[in-house]
Amino acid sequence: MKTFEPKPWVVPQPVLIIGTYNKEGVANAMNAAWAGQWDANEIMISMGKHVTTDNLKINSEFTVAFATKKTMVAADFVGIVSAKNDPKKMEKTGWDIEKATKVNAPVFTDFPMTLECRIKEKFNESETGYYLVAEIVNILVDEKYLAEDGNPDMEKMELIVFDPIHHGYIQLGDKVGNAFSDGKALK
């Protein structure tokens, strides 16, 4: 096996779009990949210093949308362009924007699934950013992405993940097994 120095190569990394409002109520979005489930109804996100972190100082509520093959170009755009430098950033995405149902934050309706969140805790704050733990207050799913059982269907969504090794986006594929079940064959 070839060896490598430590790198941020935990994979897959989700492509998450964090939605916030500024003090004037204008929607903003940023792309984040360093995030994950923290507890049953909580997530953790590593936040760098951005317009989004400034907005979260004003209002601790935000949304998290899951990027897809269809939203990839605009999702990448909001990760490389700051609202500080481009006030028309959100217009350029072409996304439809509505107010979330349970938190004071924008929902980008072009995405199949969105978490409505509220910050519970920030830690390791520094000049460059912080980590946040947020409560999932509500989950919105476009009905065309529901399975026959009424729950979200990950395969229908065409979700993408970030490849931190080659700096690409990869679409998630097909279901290959049943969690907490298939391993029983080895008992």
Regions flagged by a language model, labelled:
Residues M1-K187:
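Basic, polyanion-binding surface patches
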